[in-house]
């Protein structure tokens, strides 16, 4: 799910959709309006799921999509190799997710973990 906002309303640390990917905004710079033009904004962001750097350049009056990012908790049911089967604690649905290398020692069967979901994608979000 996504919603539309104007570029001038974006803030650092919030989310934005660039190239059909949910991204976290790292920096925003705005130029002054010229004699015959509108002010421009440059948004630098990093992909939430792929960690790729992306940028958007456009008028501050333009509308841009913002993803609806949800943080949820789930219980680890089983671990097979680098794939974990999780059960959502809210609606009790089960799904599988690949465990990133940095979380392999932190994810254990029976424990509760948090995850992020946006634009139909899921990512583990373990904060220490």
Swiss-Prot record:
Q: Per its UniProt record, what InterPro entries does this chain match? A: IF5A-like, IF5A-like_N, NA-bd_OB-fold, Rib_uL2_dom2, Trans_elong_IF5A_hypusine_site, Transl_elong_IF5A_arc, Transl_elong_IF5A_C, Translation_prot_SH3-like_sf
Question: What UniProt keywords apply to this chain's record, in alphabetical order?
Answer: Cytoplasm, Hypusine, Initiation factor, Protein biosynthesis
- Database matches in SUPFAM superfamilies: Nucleic acid-binding proteins (SSF50249), Translation proteins SH3-like domain (SSF50104)
User: List-wise, which residues carry Hypusine?
Assistant: 35
Q: Name one GO cellular component term.
A: cytoplasm
Question: Where does this one sit in the cell?
Answer: Cytoplasm
Q: Which family does it belong to?
A: Belongs to the eIF-5A family.
Q: What does this protein do?
A: Functions by promoting the formation of the first peptide bond.
Q: What is this protein called?
A: Translation initiation factor 5A
> Upper lineage ranks?
Archaea, Methanobacteriati, Methanobacteriota, Stenosarchaea group, Methanomicrobia
